[in-house]
Design a protein with these regions (language model features):
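Amphipathic alpha-helical polymerization modules
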Residues: 1-137
Length: 137
C-alpha cells in the first residue's frame, strides 16, 4: 500500500519540477542578455520524465512512479528588428528567447492537473489505509 503513496509522491515531485521550469520560461521570456551582459537570450527549459523513481522501490527492487530524467535547454531565439536597441546586431536585430507564453500557459495547466490527480490518488490511498486499520483494530 505504501507503494501507491510513493508513486503519487514521485508524480507530485515531477510535476512540481515541470511547473517550476514552465514558470522560469514565462518569467524570462524577455531576458535578452546573459550574466556578462551580452545579447545571449534565455533558453527555454523543457523537463523530461522517465518511468520509475530510483528512490521508491518495491521489496523486489522494482522502481515505482516517475522521475525527472533531465531538464534540457531548447536552443533557438526569435530575432526582432529593433535598430535603436543597444543590443542590436549590425543589421538592427536583437535576439529574444523563443518562448510562446500561450504554449507555456497550456503546459502549466496540464502540469497543474497532473499534480492535482496525484493528490487525489494519494488521498484515496490514505483513505483506504485508514479503512483497513479500522477493520484490523
Amino acid at each position: 500500500m505504501y507503494g501507491a503513496l510513493d508513486i503519487s509522491t514521485s508524480g507530485l515531485i515531477a510535476q512540481r519540477t515541470r511547473l517550476e521550469s514552465i514558470t522560469a520560461n514565462i518569467v524570462n521570456k524577455d531576458t535578452i542578455t546573459d550574466a556578462s551582459g551580452r545579447n545571449n537570450p534565455y533558453q527555454r527549459r523543457v523537463v523530461f520524465f522517465s518511468p520509475g523513481d530510483p528512490t521508491a522501490t518495491t521489496p523486489e527492487g522494482k522502481a515505482l512512479g516517475v522521475h525527472v530524467s533531465s531538464i534540457e535547454e531548447e536552443p533557438g531565439f526569435e530575432a526582432r528588428y529593433e535598430p535603436s536597441n543597444p543590443y542590436a546586431d549590425d543589421k538592427g536585430y536583437v535576439k529574444y528567447p523563443a518562448i510562446n507564453p500561450a504554449y507555456e500557459q497550456i503546459n502549466a495547466y496540464e502540469a497543474q492537473r497532473a499534480y492535482e490527480a496525484n493528490i487525489v490518488s494519494a488521498e484515496a490511498t490514505k483513505t483506504m489505509m485508514a479503512q483497513a486499520l479500522r477493520l484490523i483494530a
